[in-house]
Amino acid sequence: MLILRGAPALSAFRHSKLLEQLSQKVPAVSGLYAEFAHFAEVTGVLTGDEQQVLARLLKYGPSVPVQEPTGRLFLVLPRFGTISPWSSKASDIARNCGLAKIQRLERGIAFYVAGEFSEAEAQLIADALHDRMTQIVVANLEQAAGLFSHAEPKPLTAIDILGGGRAALEQANSELGLALAEDEIDYLMNAFQGLKRNPHDIELMMFAQANSEHCRHKIFNASWDIDGQSQEKSLFGMIKNTYQMHNEGVLSAYKDNAAVIVGSVAGRFYPNPETRQYGAVQEPVHILMKVETHNHPTAIAPFPGASTGSGGEIRDEGATGRGAKPKAGLTGFTVSNLQIPGFEQPWEVPYGKPERIVTALDIMIEGPLGGAAFNNEFGRPALTGYFRTFEQSITTPRGDEVRGYHKPIMLAGGMGNIRDEHVQKGEITVGSKLIVLGGPAMLIGLGGGAASSMATGTSSADLDFASVQRENPEMERRCQEVIDRCWQLGDNNPISFIHDVGAGGLSNAFPELVNDGGRGGRFELRNIPNDEPGMAPHEIWSNESQERYVLAVGAADFERFKAICERERCPFAVVGEATAEPQLTVTDSHFGNSPVDMPLEVLLGKAPRMHRSAVRENELGDDFDPSTLDIAESIERVLHHPAVASKSFLITIGDRTITGLVARDQMVGPWQVPVADVAVTATSFDVYTGEAMAMGERTPLALLDAPASGRMAIGETLTNIAASRINKISDIKLSANWMSAAGHPGEDARLYDTVKAVGMELCPELGITIPVGKDSMSMATRWNEEGVDKSVTSPLSLIVTGFAPVADIRQTLTPQLRMDKGTTDLILIDLGRGQNRMGASILAQTHGKLGSQAPDVDDAEDLKAFFAVIQGLNADGHLLAYHDRSDGGLLVSAVEMAFAGHCGLNLSLDAVAENTAEIAAILFNEELGAVIQVRQDATPDVLAQFSAAGLGDCVAVIGQPINNGEVSISYNGESVFTGQRRLLQRQWAETSYQIQRLRDNADCAEQEFDVVLEEDNPGLSVKLGFDVNQDIAAPYIKKGVRPQVAVLREQGVNGQVEMAAAFDRAGFNAIDVHMSDILAGRVDLNDFKGMVACGGFSYGDVLGAGEGWAKSALFNSRARDAFQGFFERTDSFTLGVCNGCQMMSNLHELIPGSEFWPHFVRNRSEQFEARVAMVQVQESNSIFLQGMAGSRMPIAIAHGEGHAEFESEEALLEADLSGCVALRFVDNHGKVTERYPANPNGSPRGITGLTSRDGRVTIMMPHPERVFRAVQNSWRPDEWNEDGAWMRMFRNARVWVN
């Protein structure tokens, strides 16, 4: 084993944060130093050259002075017997660099902690420094040799039920954490006595996962009686009723990993499987929809819990039909009170929590980062979501109970696209190869399906922790690339059947695969790729290692499939083959036995059906009179409530522009305020049709009136999605995610009554279908604190997500008030028809109350009429701004519109209030509705259209936006409230700031918080030195000559398709080139005029951002020659964007005239930054930017390591003076800036793009390829037509070639 010291592992900011954490736990800690330690398993002795290559490979990241360590060593390593994702990628890079003697590289962190402390304190320090699921702590570097020890496989265990009877099975149930019910134990006893043998632990584990509540949805399929009355339908039966009543537009429901609905016809853009040339294929582009929850893991370990939640949902989409493509994601969180230190709110009463779960604040610091990190690295934009906190002591017939979300809701969902011929699964022929695609087996996430089916606190803490999986998004990206290559083959798609691997691991996925395909299967356990050879058979078969799919590929298609996997460097293995008889057999060649041999019907057959008996309980509630409250104080409380406050901290961490198909994200208008009601994507790059997603949830209402909470969730979804241009309400399809504390008094009846209200009544009345959903039935947390039994139980929680095809993405409405459209009116549409019910409102919650009357959907016809009128007004161009009324009521809707419009408000309540006692209820009730802005001269016509639709009583003019920064509300000429917009907006932004300050670099958080106070901030703007609508490449395109550009990617790159689309539009033939093509000599760069290195996370940014990719080009002789030859050709051009920019900057020794280029390192905020930033094009030789110098315009930013670090002050000066700086960040006033967030990475002198001296090679961190169409821009000037400003850059390259 070789030991190589690495660079310091912590930035100054992370160092001081960790030191503070440690000294809080152990006050004796006086100092801390951390550095990476690398370990190499080698065969033979490395030559001098090989040592040099290895040393350069392991030098990565920012330049930080290395210290001589002092203090006690805590060496954190991957768990012995495992291979970390870092190791597999770094080892791949080493092999690609020609280091054949390196068997494996592994990395640890050496923490040196100064101070005098006891062994018990040392244990506390060790606990704080590692993740016990995947890591261990040792005391010296030599002990790392254990990383490369090879463990012996553990044997199979039989459970002696023939000798020990039922008691033996009960003991196994408890020890293995199987969560089997009494009748299931009876069922298994009968089954194995019938087979005349003892079951193996692997078979019991497999049965428990496959038959857990999590996988089988027993409660939703159960028979019911309520108050002694037998009920006709199951819960699932009532959901399916929506499909039986209205199934038009639904292509697949209830039977696959996601539902599929009809989309639009468009030119789907992808590389031709034979020629690898990108092009558009005109075809129906159907929409798939899915929303998952990952609540249990997120309570225990929020980052991996939320991360693998997003990863699992992405796999569900990819594994739909015969393979599909995920497109856009959403994330939601519901937690208990945050209790932010120093920012505790008056309604937050501390109640405590069990040891085994983390605090609500920790969930909201770590969880969103996990979800965002997976989506970012996979390459899926995160475009909408919700965040709610609720925790309150409620008086019930049994005394006081705390209701809240100690077991959180973590929602991960999204939509994708699928080809018409792949919507239905294919046929599995006998002899088909049964394949696992993706990562290796590891001992993580064991028993997750069963664990998540229990109330938190009823299983052991170790089992809880063991059931959380860990993530490797770059592996999932490789799998998706394989799936993409397969569906792009159309009728020749080699995949006949595919499932994702989720709860229960392969033990659930493979039996489900063969059973759904009407077959049995024979499997060999030792064919499963395994990074933990010491595992027992049941651990190999049932672990929930992530990023895996199982599929059936016909024998005739196998070679083609194998070639695709090898090109994408995606691991796969043939584990078994399909058999005609429905028997499940798993052999083990190591031990020469058969751990599983059973008929499929024993595993998946009719285990006993559950029956539920429920009793209705009187609804809860208390008295709440808002009329006595101080309005100004009420506004501040409501604006601080997390459900209302700015969600900025959740949004800027997630890439929202990847794919180049995003038409509407959360951030709205020139000031980029996070208030959008709906997310919208384009079908493809050549049309204006698209897809919309929006969410609705009103969970606290369920405590007052559960069916009302369900109806309101659907109502809110519709008032949100109404902001997009949808032809008719029945085009909208819903996903319903149900969370309940099943078995808690009153909750089962609330669940049944709410499903009935939604499935049998409201949805059929609206003509809307629910083709997909998910349930989580154990939403309670119980623990004992100093002898006192405590519990927190969630309200019944229905989270609804709406999906729909969009007729015209250009007509999406936003809440931004327009001050450039003359005199305008604000109109309130109140679907509550003046009832102003205040039950469970945010105002009530901020005073520790529930109220008594819940808002509700009283008449489905009102909702239908509202939707139709809004769509008509939008189609006619009458609506300037739109915002639904939701949490916080009318007051919040109106001020959020003012925040987005950077203006004031003059509101009068004369038309809606009858007396002063009603004012608070009118401002803060959360009945369904919306506020719209229309031109004053159109107001009479707009009101008349609502009247004609039967909504005349619901509409009233409530005021006007005004150009000064004042918000004033009056009634009968008397002032009700007056305040400054910027101060209200600061109150609204403060909760987000407080979390950001704890999570990220606090200086950056403060700078962003201060921007809100800038009254004179002009927002984003465009100042161009060229005509955006002129196509300067047109004369060359007309000649029909299309030069070839190599669209270069490496494993983990995810931005290639939009890059190809931009070059294609500019008149190039864009060709898909993988680094594996260059390393294998399949592609010759001499065939290309241009090369572009795309954005993403090559090798998951192992060995530094873009550095592994660059080094596999520098240290592989064939690749080095190819790149060097290309760069030296004077007729060639090169572009590197984001990860491609980082990669190219590390190739500067091959690129003439780039010797002073910087290295790109971690952003100053220490966070992934996804924003729209202003840049100014500099005077330079860049062939891409000719004729654009001096232009200022917005551009998409999405990176975690974009800070330009120059080798020296002299190099920075040289870059500046040589005319090689191509782009700089500027603030909204047009001044070059280093200030956050206008400069999101803190690069010196605003530098974010550079060129070589002759201008042929240009690198930049921003993403012009995501905003070349006008509709791709989060904000754009009204006068832009089809092209965005950045299209000019690609056309410049086409002109240069000629």
UniProtKB/Swiss-Prot annotation:
Residues binding Mg(2+): D677, E716, N720, D884
A GO term for molecular function: phosphoribosylformylglycinamidine synthase activity
EC number: 6.3.5.3
Region span, Disordered: 301-328
Pathway annotation: Purine metabolism; IMP biosynthesis via de novo pathway; 5-amino-1-(5-phospho-D-ribosyl)imidazole from N(2)-formyl-N(1)-(5-phospho-D-ribosyl)glycinamide: step 1/2
Biological classification of the source: Bacteria, Pseudomonadati, Pseudomonadota, Gammaproteobacteria, Pseudomonadales
Name of the gene: purL
Keyword entries, A-Z: ATP-binding, Cytoplasm, Glutamine amidotransferase, Ligase, Magnesium, Metal-binding, Nucleotide-binding, Purine biosynthesis
Residues binding ATP: 305-316, 384-386, 676, 886
PANTHER family, A to Z: PHOSPHORIBOSYLFORMYLGLYCINAMIDINE SYNTHASE
Name the UniProt record assigns to this protein: Phosphoribosylformylglycinamidine synthase
Alphabetical list of SUPFAM superfamilies matching this protein: Class I glutamine amidotransferase-like, FGAM synthase PurL, linker domain, PurM C-terminal domain-like, PurM N-terminal domain-like, PurS-like
Enzyme active site: C1138, H1263, E1265
Matches recorded under HAMAP family: PurL_1
Chief localisation class: cytoplasm
Biological-process GO terms, alphabetical: 'de novo' IMP biosynthetic process
Biological role stated in the UniProt entry: Phosphoribosylformylglycinamidine synthase involved in the purines biosynthetic pathway. Catalyzes the ATP-dependent conversion of formylglycinamide ribonucleotide (FGAR) and glutamine to yield formylglycinamidine ribonucleotide (FGAM) and glutamate.
Catalytic activity: N(2)-formyl-N(1)-(5-phospho-beta-D-ribosyl)glycinamide + L-glutamine + ATP + H2O = 2-formamido-N(1)-(5-O-phospho-beta-D-ribosyl)acetamidine + L-glutamate + ADP + phosphate + H(+)
Family: In the N-terminal section; belongs to the FGAMS family.
Compartmental location: Cytoplasm
